[in-house]
Swiss-Prot record:
This is Inactive ubiquitin carboxyl-terminal hydrolase 17-like protein 8. It is found in: Nucleus; Endoplasmic reticulum. It comes from Homo sapiens (Human). One of its GO terms (biological process) is regulation of apoptotic process. SUPFAM superfamilies: Cysteine proteinases.
Length: 530
């Protein structure tokens, strides 16, 4: 827990822990053994809708479809608590939610990425693999998160947990791209990270004069929900997909009948994510003040009513993690999280404290970020645990001590733990920093006068246009404290800045957030003749 009194004059408390007192598999400084890839694990056969492959050809598929480990590699019991290094509760809460994301954890523990990673510098996937491995194999203990996880983001004060969450997910997505830096945007949406967290929006405009239809498709990694007028997540989702009427001054300039005509604008989910991240917009864009209201969220959520394709049966998601902010502003207070362990028990993860709790307690929080997983995926992972498929069965002795360095080397031979490399600590961050990450986000903000659903140009009848979204190119002034990072370590490479467009992201003006409920970071254009 932490508040303004813990800012310690902006001091970054990782500085006091630069020399580790116990061995850990810190992937930021680990030398990854380049070994052959193990046999491919069985792939999931269930899919909802092809991930926009019907929209445009994919020049290069970076990961086979549904390439997610089917059998669980996670220990059934809850893992370690995380040490607060000084105003890092936002980081700890976010990491715990990611650690207990079943498909991500299973992929990390499979070691598939680190065995073939070609990045010469810090890699976020390797760093997260080391963290998740260490956390899940250290029940009953407290571990220290790697400095590299916050490099380029932490500025010595409390940050926004959702921003850090998407910063990390984006960095992992970028880490899937080495060797494919010139891939098109369609191919970038085939990474394993996108297959776990990603889906696709469909924005459909129907001209009420000529009945022409314009469809715009955009990938997403999380969904932001406006809760100003909503009392529940269900109500917020209903508001998000409610058809919008375009008439009068907002009449639609139809590219088919070449008239400004009344139209209906409908937003739906074209493809569903395996893991659904729902962000409740609790903070005021201008002041940062918190909207402290109770918003009901269910343990099971049916997303079928919000899909483009109807009458295909329920699409049920189950809750497995909740990220909570306690306080009255995004500038103070503290973060903690609730996670569901593999055996089904819920735990409150409050920095170093790990406490078992009931689902009633979980559902009574003023949640900030909700994590859902498709029910079929959760059941698949749970069944594999009950069959004892994890690589190492944690016995009674595992609850009394953390995994040793030797055990981790035995179970995860791709990780080695040399001493801290001083030149890594002193290296200038030519890689991605928070400012670098936010720059393309500002470029991608939509112009106020631009309608993303507008079909431009004169086209023949019976034409479906999937057009390229347009964005604002300006960038707001940086805050002085954002000009440099207090950590000179960085966890990812900053080349190919275009690929760093994910989620509902903060601008450089404090904690401002996109007013739209969906994420716009695609650049795709396709003309389909019916």
């Amino acid at each position: 827990m932490e508040d303004d009194s813990l800012y310690l004059g902006g001091e970054w408390q990782f500085n006091h822990f630069s020399k580790l007192t116990s061995p850990r598999p810190d992937a930021a400084f680990a030398e990854i053994q380049r070994t052959s890839l193990p046999e491919k694990s069985p792939l999931s056969s269930e899919t909802r809708v092809d991930l926009c492959d019907d929209l445009a050809p994919v020049a290069r598929q970076l990961a086979p479809r549904e390439k997610l480990p089917l059998s669980s590699r996670r220990p059934a019991a809850v893992g370690a608590g995380l040490q607060n290094m000084g105003n890092t509760c936002y980081l700890n809460a976010s990491l715990q939610c990611l650690t207990y994301t079943p498909p991500l954890a299973n992929y990390m523990l499979s070691r598939e990425h680190s065995q073939t990673c070609q990045r010469p510098k810090c890699c976020m996937l390797c760093t997260m693999q080391a963290h998740i491995t260490w956390a899940l194999h250290s029940p009953g203990h407290v571990i220290q998160p790697s400095q590299a996880l916050a490099a380029g983001f932490h500025r010595g004060k409390q940050e926004d947990a959702h921003e850090f969450l998407m910063f990390t997910v984006d960095a992992m997505k970028k880490a899937c791209l080495p060797g494919h830096k010139q891939v098109d945007h369609h191919s970038k949406d085939t990474t394993l990270i996108h297959q776990i967290f990603g889906g696709c929006w469909r924005s459909q405009i129907k001209c009420l004069h000529c009945h022409g239809i314009s469809d715009t498709f955009d990938p997403y990694l999380d969904i932001a929900l406006d809760i100003q007028a909503a009392q529940s997540v269900k109500q917020a989702l209903e508001q998000l997909v409610k058809p919008e009427e375009l008439n009068g001054e907002n009449a639609y300039p139809c590219g088919l009948c070449l008239q400004r005509a009344p139209a209906s604008n409908t937003l739906t989910l074209h493809t569903s994510a395996k893991v659904l991240i729902l962000v409740l917009k609790r903070f005021c864009d201008v002041t940062g003040n918190k909207l402290a209201k109770n918003v009901q969220y269910p343990e099971c959520l049916d997303m079928q009513p919000y899909m483009s394709q109807q009458n295909t049966g329920p699409l049920v998601y189950v809750l497995y993690a909740v990220l909570v902010h306690a306080g009255w502003s995004c500038h103070n207070g503290y973060y903690f999280s609730y996670v569901k362990a593999q055996e089904g028990q819920w735990y409150k993860m409050d920095d170093a404290e790990v406490t078992a709790c009931s689902i009633t307690s979980v559902l009574s929080q003023q949640a900030y970020v909700l994590f859902y997983i498709q029910k079929s995926e959760w059941e698949r992972h749970s069944e594999s645990v009950s069959r004892g498929r994890e690589p190492r069965a944690l016995g009674a002795e595992d609850t009394d001590r953390p995994a040793t360095q030797g055990e981790l080397k035995r179970d995860h031979p791709c990780l080695q733990v040399p001493e801290l490399d001083e030149h890594l600590v002193e290296r200038a961050t030519e890689e991605s920093t928070l400012d670098h990450w936010k720059f393309p986000q500002e470029q991608n903000k939509m112009k106020p006068e631009f309608n993303v659903r507008k079909v431009e140009g004169t086209l023949p009848p019976n034409v479906l246009v999937i057009h390229q979204s347009k964005y604002k190119c300006g960038m707001k002034n940086h805050h002085p404290e954002q000009q440099s990072s207090l950590l000179n370590l960085s966890s990812m490479n900053s080349t190919d800045q275009e690929s760093m467009n994910t989620g509902t992201l903060a601008s450089l003006q404090g904690r401002t957030r996109r007013s739209k409920g969906k994420n716009k970071h695609s650049k795709r254009s396709l003309l389909v003749c019916q």
